[in-house]
Amino acid sequence: MNQSSDAAVPPTLQAGGEPAAVLARHSLRGVVAWAAACIVSAAVAFGAYALVYPERMPAALGAVVEEITGANPQPVHLMRPARAPLSAVALLGKEIFFDQSLSASGTQSCASCHSPNRSYAPDNAFPVQIGGAHMSEAGYRPPPSLTYLYRQAPFSIGPDQGDTDVPVDLTQLASQAAGVQRAQKTALAAPAAPAMVPQGGLFWDGRADTLQDQAIGPLTNPVEMANKTPEDVAQKLSHTKYIDQFKQMFGPAIAANPSLLISEAMFAVGRYQIEDPSFHAFTSKYDYWLEGKARLTHAELHGLQLFNDKDKANCAGCHLSQPSKDGLPPVFTDTQYEALGVPRNPAIPANRNPKFFDMGVCGPFRQDLAKETQYCGMFLTPTLRNVANRKVFFHNGVYHDLKQVMDFYNLRNTSPEKIYPRDASGKVQKYNDLPAQYHANVDASDAPFDRKSGDQPAMSEADIQDIIAFLKTLSDGYHVGGS
């Protein structure tokens, strides 16, 4: 019987001679390769889309997108202060701010210690500034920056008292707070209870409540502008080239009323600081990153993560880094007071006296809380905006760069011998700028201070460099699309 040629092919072979199983494997490989190619193409397309439109990525993928692109996957709209031409009062305040004739020496103005070129901080690396009638007197503290003070509340102890016409009894508030355990500060976490600590106010010790109150201080300080009395200031104001502007705004009789003249002059200085956007520009790279308009480098992004890490730097425990719910940009301070135990600065002339101690809230420059010794050694937490522009750091100007500052935080407790000097017997003089009876006030519970001598520091050298890279993104004047 004749059979077709196909009938002679074994059942496991196709006509071409390939086993069916082999062909099936080839087919499967093709499917897998095709699927892999599709996945890769999709991943590439997704990555490209994420790179261009990171803000459109699902929230669940935010961390991944942030790490890959350096962009903020959840941008926000920041509510910056409104910009408008300066009012006549603010323009008058600007004249006063730059007027050297108001000092006893005739050579010093507000801007001498608060330079616009240095974010309204000193334009030199001196630990304290030189002033006085003959420009020969050394100060006691480095002048803080005048930027980002427009939201500063008056000094209080415990929760903000809000608007009230009733004078606040600080001694009574201090007594009420004395029995309350200090709340631990944790980055990106709200405290479990209201913080019963000093907060708000101006100067390192909070002794002024408003910009107007703060402005008069240097004018009559014997180591600053050195006028002997407020009346001396009024006399100088009455001979300025802008006295006619005072008369136009407040009436011709103001020149004969020293108290009113000074009050209106200091109000004008305060208005200048409120209205001029250079005092609170919010034009840093970080601001634009928050808005999705700029991207952080890997080092800057890692630095931000460490800044916000409660177990690492924990900087955001005091230097708040997140916008408010209604979009107010962060000013990088909780405006509270801390005793950090920074080492004594021998470069300050006053410190040559071994009995002199600058103890912040409890003296010597404010006396109303001198008996509240639980606050000795506490100083205002400053903003970190424009911190990379500063040339001295902390209330005594003991450090001159951010690396030294970060080393202090990292090594104060783990390697105190690297931070503090030794006495004649070789013992490390820890917290040597604070009398021994107040050492318990120093923060030793919040990271990175929650470690003991010999422990591993919270941050590596690489971590510190990345944090510094992030801190530099807080400088105003960043141009979107460039540096």
Language-model region placement:
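Periplasmic c-type cytochrome electron-transfer domains
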Residues: 2-483
